[in-house]
Amino acid sequence: MRTIRRVVLLLWVMEEGKFRELLEQNYTWPALYMFKFICPANNEAVAKLEQLFDPEVAELSLRPSSKGNYVSFTAKELMISVDAVIERYRLATDIPGLISL
C-alpha cells in the first residue's frame, strides 16, 4: 500500500505543474472553486473527506452511487489561491480509495 501511495504522490508532483498552470489561466484569485471526489461508501472515508472542508464556509453535497458502494462528494468553497487548492488536494491523497475528479 505504501508503494502505491508513493507512486500516486510521484504522479501528483509530475502533474502539479500542468494543474497549477490551468488554474492560473482559468481563475482570478480568490475564486469559488468546486472540488469533486468519489470515495468508498464507508463512514471513515466520508468522514475524513468531510474534515477537509469547513461546512460553515463550504457548500457540501454527497450523493451515493446507485449500488451504494461509492459516494460522490462535491464541495464549493471560496479559495484564496492556487496554492490553497493544490494543498487541499494533497491532503485528500491520504484518504484510501479516493478518486479526485
Task: Label each PLM-derived region with a short phrase.
Residues R2-S72, L78-L101:
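Long, contiguous binding/interaction regions
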